[in-house]
Structure formats: C-alpha cells, structure tokens
Amino acid sequence: MKTDIDIAQSITLKPITEIVEKVGISFDDIELYGKYKAKLSFDKINAVKDNAPGKLILVTAINPTPAGEGKSTITIGLADALSKIGKKTMIALREPSLGPVMGIKGGAAGGGYAQVLPMEDINLHFTGDMHAITTANNALSALIDNHIHQGNVIGIDQRRIIWKRVVDLNDRALRKVTVGLGGPLNGIPREDGFDITVASEIMAILCLATDINDLKERLANIVIGYRFDCSPVYVRDLAVEGALTLILKDAIKPNLVQTIYGTPAFVHGGPFANIAHGCNSVLATTTALRLADYTVTEAGFGADLGAEKFLDIKVPNLPKAPDAVVIVATLRALKMHGGVAKTELSAENVEAVKAGFSNLKRHVENIRKYGIPAVVAINEFVSDTAAEIAVLKELCAAIGVPVELASVWANGADGGVELAETVVATIDNQAASYQRLYKSEDSLEEKVTKIVTQIYGGTGVVFEKKARNQLTEFAKNGWDKLPVCMAKTQYSFSDDQFALGAPTDFDITVREFVPKLGAGFIVALTGDVMTMPGLPKAPVALNMDVAADGTAIGLF
C-alpha cells in the first residue's frame, strides 16, 4: 500500500498560477514562493471585500483517539468532491506545526488521495510564517528584558512577566528556564519558559487580524506582565508594536496551494485547539468566502474544543457563520469510546459502536445548540464491517442527523461525492440560524460554566484559588467581557483524558486564567494541559531522512 508521501510524490503538480485562476485570482494578485506556492496580495483581498460570501462548511470531529479520525483528510476530500459535482470550491486549512510533525503526527496535510500539496513543503518550513511568528514573539521577549536591563522606566515587575519565549518544536526541557545569568552585563536574572510557537498569542492574533492595522492594534494590546503596583503592562507601553508588525508583514498574507485534484486551498495560521482557538486565519476564511461558492474549513480536535471556539470566538470576526457542520467519526474511534482497547479495534463489535455513539450524539446535539445543521461523515476504514456501518446509520437516523460514508483517503474525490451531495442538500433545505452559546456581557464565570454544562455535559466548575482571585482582578480591569478560550484535554469532554464516551457527573477544574487581550480572549487553563508539548519515546523523526536528490523520506 502506498504511503501518503508516496502518493504525494507521484502527483504532477500544476503551477499555482493555473490553479488560482479557477477562483478569479490572476498572476498579478499573488506573490510566488516557487512554482507551487504563493501568497495572496492585499490588493486582491481588498478588491473582493465587498463580494457576497458563499456557503461555509465547518468540518469538526468526535473526541479524537489514537485510532485517528482523519478530519483534515475529510475536509480536503469533501472540497474535491464539491468541485467534482460542479461547485466552485476553496479550502481554508491551518498550517502544520513542526513540533508534532517531528513528534507523533509525521505530517498534517491530509492523507491518501485527499492531500494538499506540496506536502513536504507545507509540513516543513512552507512560506516561513512559523519562523516569522517565532521571531516576532522572541523579539518581544528580548525587548522586554532589554527594557528592564536599561533601567526599567515603566516599572515592570520581573517576577510577574507572563510573556514567554517560543520555538516550533516539542521540547519539554524548555518549559521552565532561567534567563539573564552570567553577571550584570547579561541582563537581570529571572524565571522564564518556552511555549510551542502555535501556542503564542501572536499566532492567535495573526489568525484573528483582519488587516495590517488591526494586526498592529492587536499586538499593541498584548499584556506582557505587571508593574510593581500590579497594574498590567501592554506592548504599547514599550512602543514596539510597529516593529512586531514589520516582522509579520508578509506572514499575515494567506498562503495558496492545491489539492491532488487541483482545488485551490488557503493554508494559513496554525493555533492548536487544546491550548489556543484552533482555527486557520480569519483573512484566509473570509477571502475564500468572497472568492468561492463553497468554502470548506476545519477546526482542531473534537467539536467540544475546535468547533466551540470557531463558533464562539472566530465567527464574530467572519462575514457569516457556517451553513453546515460536518462531524467526522470512524467506527474504530467509536469502538474505543465504547470501551474497546486499541489492539482490538479491527474486530467487529456492534455493541461497542452503540456504546461509543454517545460521544458522537453529544457532539451533534451541541452543534444544534448553535442553530446550525449537522451532517455525520464516517471516514471509512478497511476493518469496518457491514453490521457496524448499518447500526451507526440506524443510530444517526434515530436522532435525525444525515450520515454518509466517505472513502476519500482511498478514492479521492470519487469517495466523497455522496457526502458532498448530502451536505449541499442539507444547506439548501435547512437554513442555519446561528446563535452564540454565551453573551459578551456574561461574566467569565458564567461563560466558563455555560461551556462546561452545555457543551461538555459537566455538572459545574471548580475555580482554584488563583483562578478565583483572577475572576475579581479581570472584572476590575474590564477583561471579563471577552470570550473564553478553554485549554483542556482533547481526548474527553471532561478534563480527565481517560474519561471517554460521554461522561456525566463531573466538574471541570480551572486552575488559572491567562489574559490574551491582543487575540481578544481569556484562556482558562484546566487539568494538566501544557503549552509546550514533549516528544514521545519513539518520535517519528527517527524515521525521517532525505535522499541524495533532495527527496523527503518519512513524512506521512
């Protein structure tokens, strides 16, 4: 069987100039990064800003398991299938982070015959956006430490700096470090730490900014720490937002690539959904809506994280809410949610499918709370049996949700035609009536509680002492009217990663809040979620190499 990289390297790509013509983008509208990658100019973005938006399809999933759900694969395959049935379609995806690519994922550009290309470039350095975000983040760290070293005119309390350095790798050794050692010429010693780049607030800002001016304003609003009198210190107090914007002036432009079947795709921005808001850039999604009749996008991890954040944080910054939400599930994952061990997933187990359906059902119910119709996509595996498929279809029918098999990994666009037709029919026959889960005027405590009780299915929220004190502090600062971005394990509705299925009678513990005023939300840290991942015992980097002719080996 061919691997993803084997398939990708067997495809003859078309010049990106030819691909983007399908959606009305000319040679003069793009900035080329070789023959197959480009960035879209702001002139073109501004030229289409008054176009009526097309239909928006959000792809999400059940809570992920080690068995894998294939959300990006379905996103790409669905878009190719929409193109195949005659719909003018674009994709809007996130950029992969090099840390997970070298750790456990091996790549994040789809799979099989549903990939965005050139996958090697996309999975590695691409157009340099990650480097620019990393540099801007660390430039701010350097400027903070320099300000303190040079006299600390604005009175930053070096014990209360919350801004961390970043690197686009999984490196647990950098979670906590000490900087400024080596004597007075090397700065003021203080505790610091590293996050992974995709957890940086600058990544979130880049993905929520609507133009250069908005980017600069958001950067100016970043809270980097506190003074000795406990008042917040903003980037604007250091007067460096202009320099940071300069570093990011090209990174903010959306990247254009293609699928195996030639569907134009924006791949831009990449915040994680468990520790950030998990969506590609507003600029990419908005521009795709202005250029195409159908835009297919995705949100990270399960619908309890990525979709909730898409609908509560990203949608208010878009021209419209989704017309439909596709929830990806696999029979293998449903069986795991039903109590089957990973080693036994290939064996038929209808009862486990029935038990695991509770997870999918809760996600469907949650999407409906937003007033948006849902469609279930079963990402097909060779181990799926007719009996398992039949019972899943019966269970979906019982709750009135359309369901289709999708074999886009093996069959590309052909394997997604029925799904595409069902999604189009759903959009045509069921008008979405989007409503946000909470109101802006709700307190932080109320917002978190609504997410926990209405989306996660929990009983309530336990705020640890630090978080409880921050509720008062943030309300005093006027920050409590911002949206909440929950940092939680992706594997469960609860904050216990081992509580699979649809757990009930649990509380979520919030240990701390982190203000992300530039991004425009407050992060609530739960459980033991970390903003700098570590590598597994056997990282997939051990299998990566490059041939003498420069061909990449080991990505998947």
Swiss-Prot record:
SUPFAM superfamilies (UniProt xref): P-loop containing nucleoside triphosphate hydrolases
Associated pathway: One-carbon metabolism; tetrahydrofolate interconversion
GO MF annotations, alphabetized: ATP binding; formate-tetrahydrofolate ligase activity
The protein's Enzyme Commission number: 6.3.4.3
PROSITE patterns named among the record's database cross-references: FTHFS_1 (PS00721), FTHFS_2 (PS00722)
Residues where ATP binds: 65-72
Biological process according to GO: tetrahydrofolate interconversion
Name of the top EC class for this enzyme: ligase
Swiss-Prot/TrEMBL keywords: ATP-binding, Ligase, Nucleotide-binding, One-carbon metabolism
Reactions performed catalytically: (6S)-5,6,7,8-tetrahydrofolate + formate + ATP = (6R)-10-formyltetrahydrofolate + ADP + phosphate
Pfam families registered for this protein in UniProt: FTHFS
CDD domains: FTHFS
Cross-referenced InterPro entries: Formate_THF_ligase, Formate_THF_ligase_CS, P-loop_NTPase
Record family assignment: Belongs to the formate--tetrahydrofolate ligase family.
Protein name: Formate--tetrahydrofolate ligase
Species this chain originates from: Streptococcus suis (strain 05ZYH33)
